[in-house]
């Protein structure tokens, strides 16, 4: 399936995870404007990488393990206005983080991690790889962030609410701090089902916890959502 944004186009036909509202929200929310070196872990089709390229002047490094997704990511990067600032690394993030040139190198890391911790696997192997934490669990993900993030850098993620407690338990075993958290509601007056998280190597006070509602009771995007995503969605 192809998806056209205001400044770039995504072809995600061969990716395990297609373009999603989760990814768009994360890419629009992450504080990327001042970042000079940005790492996209588990890049998939390259959506977050290209959103980061649009929102910053930084160099983008995308890491993707699955072969078909990596090919789609590379293609989407080369077709974008920011091809010269984007590079794809086809491999696993643990190996990438062992490379000396990447340790402590990135001032922003962005990731929409796999989120099915339990339950039946997807039927196609590449889709299952994208959605199951056994490919990249929270502990190795946080280890990779710790290795690659600069001391003054930030990491932005989005997770299902039901995974939040387990993620925070893993976070407690690292030298990373949760400095900002946004609970995301799909519809007004419904319980939040996603959380945007901002991590840092330095503790920030006061800790911030806010809310974002995607749609009102009338089914239309809220003013919050419009303001957040207006630079990307064609009809906003």
Curated annotation (Swiss-Prot):
Keyword terms, alphabetized: Cytoplasm, Methyltransferase, S-adenosyl-L-methionine, Transferase, tRNA processing
Catalytic activity: adenosine(37) in tRNA1(Val) + S-adenosyl-L-methionine = N(6)-methyladenosine(37) in tRNA1(Val) + S-adenosyl-L-homocysteine + H(+)
EC number(s) per entry: 2.1.1.223
InterPro entries, A to Z: DNA_methylase_N6_adenine_CS (IPR002052), SAM-dependent_MTases_sf (IPR029063), Small_mtfrase_dom (IPR007848), tRNA_Adenine-N(6)_MTase (IPR050210), tRNA_adenine-N6_MeTrfase (IPR022882)
Transmembrane segments: none
Domain of life: Bacteria
GO cellular component entries: cytoplasm
MF term (GO), any: tRNA (adenine-N6)-methyltransferase activity
GO biological process, one term: methylation
Keyword match Methyltransferase: yes
Family as reported in the entry's similarity comment: Belongs to the methyltransferase superfamily. tRNA (adenine-N(6)-)-methyltransferase family.
Job of this protein: Specifically methylates the adenine in position 37 of tRNA(1)(Val) (anticodon cmo5UAC).
HAMAP family the UniProt entry points to: tRNA_methyltr_YfiC (MF_01872)
Protein name from the UniProt record: tRNA1(Val) (adenine(37)-N6)-methyltransferase
Species per Swiss-Prot/TrEMBL record: Shewanella sp. (strain MR-4)
Organism lineage: Bacteria, Pseudomonadati, Pseudomonadota, Gammaproteobacteria, Alteromonadales
């Amino acid at each position: 399936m192809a998806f056209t944004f205001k400044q770039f186009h995504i072809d995600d036909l061969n990716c395990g995870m297609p373009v999603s509202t989760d990814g768009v929200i994360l890419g629009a929310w992450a504080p990327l404007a001042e970042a000079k070196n940005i790492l996209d872990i588990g890049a998939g089709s390259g959506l977050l990488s290209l959103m980061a390229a649009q929102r910053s002047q930084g160099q983008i490094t995308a890491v993707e393990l699955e072969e078909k997704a990596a090919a789609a990511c590379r293609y989407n990067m080369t077709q974008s206005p920011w091809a010269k600032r984007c590079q794809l690394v086809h491999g696993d993030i643990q190996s990438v983080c062992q490379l000396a040139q990447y340790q402590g190198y990135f001032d922003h890391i962005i990731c929409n991690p796999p989120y099915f911790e339990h339950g039946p696997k997807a039927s196609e192997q590449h889709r299952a790889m994208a959605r199951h934490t056994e490919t990249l669990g929270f502990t190795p993900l946080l280890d990779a962030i710790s290795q690659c993030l600069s001391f003054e850098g930030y990491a932005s993620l989005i997770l299902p609410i039901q995974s939040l407690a387990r993620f925070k338990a893993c976070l407690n075993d690292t030298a990373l701090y949760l400095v900002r958290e946004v609970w995301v509601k799909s519809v007004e007056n419904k319980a939040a089902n996603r959380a945007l998280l901002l991590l840092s190597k330095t503790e920030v006070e006061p800790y911030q916890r806010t809310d974002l509602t995607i749609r009102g009771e009338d089914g239309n995007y809220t003013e919050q959502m419009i303001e957040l995503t207006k630079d990307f969605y064609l009809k906003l």
